[in-house]
Regions:
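Hydrophobic helix-and-loop "lid/oligomerization" segment in the mid-to-C-terminal part
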Residues: 1-126
């Protein structure tokens, strides 16, 4: 069994509990900047994996500050290719695990992600 720092564990739990369900199939959440010393890309990946445990969630996205950029970690199951989504945001990855790094705020990253998802849904790309 893997164990976590209690503060990091509680940050992950908070992020999961505050997730927004977008377009009925996509979970989006953020990690707070005030605990940035505890947040790493692995933290974001753990949250993204946890969000996939919910029924009807096809893909999950976690936006968080890391080393003066905003990271988006993406995970998926079923038929959603998160690599394609992250490529639209300047990132990359694999079918079920991908990421992007943006030069903006967390809120702006969430907005860009939602715009990208909306466009891709309308165009039948996802």
């Amino acid at each position: 069994m893997f164990r976590s720092n209690p503060t990091e564990y509680l940050l992950r739990a908070q992020a999961v509990s505050q997730a927004e369900i977008f377009e009925c199939s996509y979970a989006i959440t953020t990690l707070p900047a005030d605990n940035s010393s505890l947040i790493t890309p692995a933290t974001g990946a753990k949250v993204a994996n946890s969000l996939l445990e919910m029924d009807n969630i096809k893909a999950s996205f976690v936006c968080f500050p890391y080393k003066s950029q905003i990271y988006i970690n993406a995970r998926s199951i079923d038929d959603v290719n998160v690599q394609l989504i992250m490529e639209k945001l300047g990132g990359g990855g694999h079918l079920s695990a991908a990421a992007a790094q943006l030069e903006c705020t967390v809120d702006e990253a969430v907005d860009k992600l939602k715009e990208t998802l909306t466009t891709m849904l309308k165009e039948g790309e996802i």
